[in-house]
Structure formats: C-alpha cells, structure tokens
C-alpha cells in the first residue's frame, strides 16, 4: 500500500498507521491511540486485529480501510468502548465480540462523536449500545447484524442521531429505545429479518421515527408501549415509515413488549 492510499488528515496533525504485518507500524489500534495527539488520526490497514479499544475524555479519529477489510475483535469484553468522547470520527471498521459473557460490540456512553460505515456483530447483548444523558453521537450508515439481543439499543437518556443503518438478523429487535429522557432521531434505517420486531419503543422513551423501512421481521414492524412517545404519533407511523410485510402487522401497542422473551 502506497502513501497515496493513506487518507488525508483534515485536522492537520499526523497519521499513525496500524499494520500488524509490517513491523514499521503499530501492531494494534489501541497502541496507536495511546500515542495519538489531539490533532492526529489513526489509520488501520486491512487485517484482523485482536484488540480492545477504550477512549475517554478526549476526541478520537480512527479510520479503517473499510469494514470488509478491517476487523477488530475481542474475547474479553467488547472491542470498542467510548466514554465522554467529545468529538471525532470512527469509520471503516468491523467490530466483533467473540466471547461468551454479556458484552456489546460497540459501547458509547455520553459521547458526541461520529461513527459511520462500520459494522457491529455478534454481541451477546445488543450490538451497539448508546446511553447516558450526554450521549449525542451520530451513528450513521452502519451495519448491525447477528447480535444476540437487539441491533442498536438506546437508553438512559441518550439522544443520538441514528440514521441510514442496516439492522438485520438480530435475535431481538433491529432498534430498541428505552427510558425517560431517551429521545433519538431514527431516520432512514432499514430493520430487516430480526427475530422479534423491527423497532421497539418502551418504558417512557421518546423518538423521532421517520422514513424507516421495517420489513420481514418475525413479529411487527414497530412495537411500542402506551407510555412511549413517538413522533409522529402512533396512528401516523405507518404513513411516515414503511412497515409492511411483517407477519403480525405494521405496528402495535402493548403493555408487555418483552413477553415473548420471558421478561
């Protein structure tokens, strides 16, 4: 790979390169991030990396060569944890949890960075968790697939923008939103072939829900509890989204949305 293929750093700092097959470069993304300054970016060349990335109280710029070319996996905990990350961008990486304990592939607490063109898969919990009252992350154009619970779970007062994602073949819901104060923007996501419903809104949660496609899920296109607050209101959701071709129907309101999984 020549220098022309290394992405430009718009911040004007250095680009630290990760390449496990070339001893001139960093062997793991976490090692490069330890040395990265505020204006630096980390670029990950194609490969499979066993690593655990934890970033807190700073911005981050972590760029992979593409989610089909770069995989970061972890056996002991989720491969990506962001805590109070106040800016930056993560893109072009597949995050995969291969352990047996209860962890997610991508964990975002009270952060405001952009995560795009990534993939989150095989979490024992939800693939992606976005949580905390200061969470304003932008999660867009990602694939979230084959996780043991839901694809994307927004809770504990988070208000992220969740758009243009493909959430498929997750064991519970494509996207789930819970708790008072939680108010994501769910826009133009595709929730397909999930084993329960496409989108779940419950326990006093709010959400903007427009232009989403929920199809071929095992239950409903959209499921909500009476205490939830969708925008638009419930009887307008079918017009604002594509909720057809789900066996039980477009949407329903239920006091016990988790009864099918014994909760």
Locate the predicted segments by residue.
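Short aromatic-glycine-(Arg/Gly/Cys) micro-motifs in beta-strand/loop hairpins
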Residues: 2-19
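Short glycine/acidic-rich loop motifs that flank beta-strands on beta-rich extracellular proteins
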Residues: 49-55, 67, 73-79, 99-105, ...
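Extracellular beta-strand repeat scaffolds in secreted/surface proteins
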Residues: 40-44, 62-64, 243
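Right-handed parallel beta-helix/beta-spiral solenoid domain characteristic of secreted/periplasmic
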Residues: 20-27, 59-104
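Right-handed parallel beta-helix
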Residues: 94-161, 166
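All-beta strand scaffolds that present successive hydrophobic residues in beta-strands
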Residues: 61-64, 88-92, 113-117, 136-140, ...
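Acidic Gly/Asp/Thr-rich repetitive segments characteristic of extracellular carbohydrate-active
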Residues: 14-50
